[in-house]
Regions:
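Peripheral (often C-terminal) accessory segments that flank ATP-dependent C-N-forming ligase machineries
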Residues: 263-351
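Phosphate-binding site of ATP-dependent enzymes
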Residues: 124-184, 199-200, 206, 227, ...
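Active-site nucleotide/adenylate-binding loops and adjacent lid/helix of ATP-dependent enzymes
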Residues: 16, 58-146, 168-169, 203
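A short, GP-enriched loop/loop-strand-helix hinge that lies immediately N-terminal to
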Residues: 19-62, 77-80
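Glycine-rich phosphate/pyrophosphate-binding beta-alpha loops
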Residues: 181-193, 240-254
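Oxyanion-binding "anion nests"
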Residues: 189-190, 198-223
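Glycine-rich, highly charged phosphate/nucleotide-binding loops
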Residues: 1-15
């Protein structure tokens, strides 16, 4: 029940009261908790350092339809997009061609619904498939909007992820750009990155830095985008207000994300702008899965080279937190990845 409004603030205030002489830093790992922190920021500030934006800015950038309006203002490209509502679901159509992406506009509400064939993101290749997916979603408890987008051509390696930390002074302190090699393909994991190599694009980083500073952002920001080979532009999908699981690729490359926020809010250590450039491979899947399902080419060759050089990290493996029981669990987890990729690879329909 911690994710319920009437429980959330009292529970956190109680935690703070148990540490009266300590400065506490409040961070969220999920969308629902990040939003709760932001909505209750003024009540929490007397008890915690709260490195998050205000609610008014959150409302402008979290819903995808609002985010794309801001993209227009700042010159960011984004996929052709249409909005399907519960009210217009039976007549809904869009003015772009198949295949299309179908995903929930409200990720928190979607997370809490259930229906047969549920996936984090769907790909529909024709009208019949589109209608079946929309019907299945709206027969569940989810009644919020659906974002319908053109499918940007290219495999997982065309994706990019950009992580940033913006200090309490409103200035960007750290930016890192990652090139995913492979995503997860299980129903609940579609779109979550499974292997990333750091890359660098100064023009893109400069553009995003100006955007974050100009809108008054602070705290962690995480952008998902895809390179469109048709016009040579990055198409922005969304901004997340917190780090994701794969954000450890930044720390693995030598720039500890948690150190940035701790130095800024807890220790008041001045920080200069850093663009991460060092190459490193982060992965959460076994190497066998990466090289079986990753697309052969320069990026996969680079992964092989980084592994050979020892520049590779799977953050589940930590020598200070290891035991026979944990080893068994991680081994089973790896075996499960082989099973999941065999079963679900490139299956993004309703079946």
């Amino acid at each position: 029940r911690l994710n319920e409004q009437d429980v959330f603030v009292p529970a956190l205030v109680k935690v703070a009261s148990e540490h009266p002489n300590q400065k506490l830093l409040l961070l969220a790992c999920g969308d629902d908790y990040a939003k709760l922190i932001i909505k209750n920021k003024q009540e929490l500030l007397p008890h915690f350092a709260v490195p998050y934006i205000d609610e008014s800015l959150m409302e402008r950038i979290v819903l995808k339809e609002n985010f794309y309006e801001i993209c227009e203002q700042y010159g960011f490209a984004y996929p052709k997009t249409a909005l399907c509502t519960f009210e217009n679901k039976d007549e809904f159509n869009m003015d772009f061609t198949y295949p299309i992406i179908i995903k929930a506009s409200n990720s928190v509400a979607y997370w809490n619904c259930s229906f047969p064939g549920k996936k984090k993101v769907f790909v529909a290749h024709d009208v019949a498939e589109k209608n079946a997916i929309i019907k299945a979603i709206y027969e569940s408890t989810y009644k919020d909007n659906l974002t319908i987008q053109e499918f940007i051509p290219g495999d997982d390696s065309f994706m990019r992820v950009l992580n940033a930390y913006v200090g309490k002074d409103g200035k960007v302190k750290l930016m890192s750009l990652g090139n995913p090699i492979l995503e997860e393909h299980s129903p609940e994991g579609i779109g979550s990155y499974a292997a990333i190599i750091n890359t660098f694009d100064e023009a893109l980083l400069d553009k995003v830095r100006f955007f974050l500073e100009d809108i008054g952002y602070n705290g962690f920001a995480n952008f998902d985008m895809k390179y469109d080979s048709r016009d040579g532009e990055y198409k922005l999908f969304e901004i997340n207000l917190r780090n994701g699981r794969s954000s450890y690729y930044v720390t693995a490359s030598g720039h500890n994300l948690m150190q940035y926020v701790a130095d800024d809010h807890m220790l008041n250590i001045p920080q200069e702008l850093t663009y991460a450039k060092d190459k490193h491979l982060w992965m959460i899947i076994p190497k066998g899965v990466l090289f079986k399902y990753g697309k052969e080419g320069p990026l996969l060759d680079e992964a092989r080279q980084l592994i050979e050089e020892g520049k590779v990290t799977n953050h589940l493996y930590y020598s200070e937190d290891f035991s026979p029981k944990r080893w068994v669990k991680l081994t089973l987890n790896n075996l499960n990845y082989y099973r999941k990729y065999k079963k679900y690879f490139n299956n993004k329909g309703l079946s």
